[in-house]
Each structure stands twice: as C-alpha cells, then as structure tokens.
Amino acid sequence: MSQLNDSDIILFEYNFHYQNIRSKNTLDIAFGIDRNFLFGCGVAIASILLNNREISCEFHVFTDYISDKDKLYFSDLAKQYNSRINIYVINCDKLKSLPSTKNWTYATYFRFIIADYFYNKHEKILYLDADIACKGSIKELLDYQFSTNEIAAVVTERDVEWWQNRASVLTTPQLASGYFNAGFLLINIDEWNLNNISSKAIEMLRDPDWVSKITHLDQDVLNVLLNGKVKFISGKYNTRYSINYELKDKVDNPVNDDTVFIHYVGPTKPWHEWADYPVSRSFLIAKASSPWCKEDLLKPVNSNQYRYCAKHKFKQKHYMAGIFNYLKYYNCLLYTSDAADDVALHC
C-alpha cells in the first residue's frame, strides 16, 4: 500500500489542454522538480515537442511551487504545440524527513509520487529529470512493450568498475551486471505498484543501516529494489554529459547524431549564462522555440556558481568577466554564509 496517497500529496492541479481529445496512442511523460528547475523543465518539454511533432505526448509536472507567470508559460507552451500539460502542486511534508544532500533536495523523491499517482490511470510513464534536452525521436518509447515482470526500462550509468563498486557498497552482487541512472525511467506502472516499490524505497530511506550505505539516495535504492526486473536499453536515451567537463584540456563528448536525450548532469546547466558551448545548443534551440524565448539565461547567485562561472569565463577567454566573477566568489566567502554551499541541483 502506498505511503503517498493522492489526497495527502496533491494540493492543486492545473490542466492546460489544447489537444481537445486525447489520442489513444499517447506517451505520458512526467517530471518532478522544485522551483530551480521550472525554467529547465519548460524548455525540456519544448525540446520533446519540437522533435516529435508526429507523436501524441501528454506532460505531467510535479512541483512544490509554481508562480502565475510559470503557469502562463506552460499554458502558452501547450497552446503553441497543440499539446496537453498538467501541473501538480504537491505537499512535500512526508518527503522532507528523508535524506538529502547539497546536490539532491527532497525533490529527487517526487518520482515515487509520480509512479504511485498514475496507478490505475495509465499503464506506462516516462519519467525524466528536468535537466535534459531532446534532439531525436521517442517513437520507440511510445511503442515499447514490457516483458513479463519487467518494472522499468533504464539506461546504465558509467562502466563496469562503477557497477562493481555499487554492488559492493550496496551489498547487492547482481548490480555488478548493470547499475542504472534514475534520470530516465520508462515505468511499467502496474508492476511498480504490484511490487510496492515506492513504499519499500521510503522504508529503506528511513533505515539507518541503508542510509549509511547509500551515496546516490533514491537512485541507489531503486537499483537495489529493481535489480533483475529492469531492461537496459540504448544509451541514446540518457546520454549524460557534465558541462563542467569543458574545463578539461581534452573533452570526450558522448553526444552524437544518434543521441535522443542529452542529460546535463553536474552543477552547470544549459540555462546558465556561462554554459556557452556547442553541447548546450539543443537546449538553446528549444528555448528559442518556446514561451521562454525572451527569458535571459541565469546568472550566478551564490559562491559555487560564481566560482564555476569564473572558471568557464576564463576557458572561453572572457578574462575580465572571469576576474569579475572570481571577485564575486571571494566576496561571498568573506561576507556570506553560503561559502560551502553548492547549488541545490539534481545530478
């Protein structure tokens, strides 16, 4: 039985439906975000719509905050692409007691709410982190058929050495055969709920023994619970890249012509004004084709962002801007309490 019942969790729901009749062959796509990701989420949805005009998609955004301006933008986006977008404002009280870090807030647990909410409503949900940009067709995901007992289709994270590390740390030997990134989950809703995944995950996250082992919060927990019940599909659906890799002398960029979803992991996101690299292009194209087209890219607001902004400005040979942002960074160290803070962003 789920610990995340609709009546306790969903406070408000806003529906922006400009496709009057929902197609029977529709892919439902869900995001779980806090206010820091509203901009990115809107553009992520635009990127999917821009590259999949022949596919019927309905979008579901679960958030703990939304302004009137945000609602207007999401409504305009649905109207622009003749689509359907639903916003759910949620009560996070039951999630705030769960473990969090400077990089992952309680918003990372919204995917549990999502998987439970759609039980008996839809058979399949594509969950995506909001720091993605789509640059290809998702028709294969629309047509995807789950095999018997399969709970989710997923994409592996990193390499065999990492899988073995997770298998050892999480005392789950089966993970040596594959460990997935939870930023992409094509979920079999019935199987997820029949196996009580959300409830079991929350119980593990409240167990001190498990909390002492996990470093990647719900991602670690889901890998343990779903081991042997997932199918690993092509990496093109979750091609992870940190824009901070651009600071290296040599960059191995996995994004190619086959990539469907670029997943911008790490603290620098494509909506930051210092993320001026070719890998951000898919995001910027979608932004230009969305209601957010006239919104400025975000400037740094805390010590961690000033530091990364300065590094990137020097890499881009904008030396005066680099010096300015280093000065802002050191000013934060001297006069504010956020010197040790990182941006509260999903990785």
Model segments located where?
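Short aromatic/hydrophobic "clamp" motif used to bind/position activated sugar donors
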Residues: 125
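The conserved acidic donor/metal-binding loop of glycosyltransferases
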Residues: 129-133
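Conserved small/polar residues in nucleotide/adenosyl-binding loops
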Residues: 335-340
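Active-site-proximal specificity loops/subdomain of glycosyltransferases
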Residues: 81-116
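Conserved donor-nucleotide/metal-binding helix-loop-beta segment in metal-dependent transferases, i.e.
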Residues: 136-162
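Histidine-anchored nucleotide/phosphate-binding helix
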Residues: 38-52
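N-proximal low-complexity "stem/linker" segments adjacent to membrane-targeting elements
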Residues: 1-32
